[in-house]
A protein has these predicted regions:
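Two-component/phosphorelay signaling modules centered on CheY-like receiver
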Residues: 14-33
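Acidic, metal-coordinating helix/loop segments flanking the phosphotransfer/catalytic sites
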Residues: 34-52
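Acidic catalytic/metal-coordinating carboxylates
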Residues: 36-37, 63-66
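Short amphipathic alpha-helix used as the core "switch/output" element in two-component signaling
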Residues: 43, 65-76
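Receiver (REC) domain active-site loop signature in two-component systems and cognate sites
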Residues: 59
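Alpha4 helix (beta4-alpha4-beta5 surface) of REC/receiver domains from two-component response regulators
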Residues: 66, 87-104
């Protein structure tokens, strides 16, 4: 039996959460937990370990870089992929400096390419 990867997805756009959750769950290789509220997501992160965190950068209440900082304080080895519609170099560099493993651009070119990228991160 193959290992199921536990994935936490944090994005304020419910359409993104639904799309990614359905896509990843369909493969049977992932156990997906989603949150549209970053504060609730941090609470879940404090109670459960995840193989991967997919984290939107632009969110109300607390932006993704602030969430990333809290995640890395708890687990400096956590694999995190930042999701952004903004490819500004400063945000990408800051997320890497804060400990993000990688980033992806929204909208996604294809969900299959997106999955390849997260599998690459999970297996690194």
């Amino acid at each position: 039996m193959n290992k199921k990867y536990s994935v936490l997805i944090v994005d304020d756009e419910t359409e993104i959460l639904t799309m990614l959750s359905r896509f990843l769950n369909r493969s049977g290789s992932y156990d997906v937990t989603t949150y549209s509220n970053p504060i609730s997501a941090l609470d879940a992160f404090s109670r459960q370990e995840f193989d991967l965190v997919l984290l939107d950068i632009m969110m109300p209440q607390m932006n993704g870089l602030e969430v990333l900082e809290k995640v890395m304080e708890k687990n400096s080895e956590q694999k995190v992929v930042m999701m952004t519609a903004y490819s500004t170099l400063d945000k990408v560099l800051k997320s890497h400096k804060e400990g993000a493993t990688n980033y992806v651009m929204k909208p996604f070119d294809s969900l299959q390419a997106f999955e390849r990228k997260i599998l690459e991160v999970l297996k690194s």
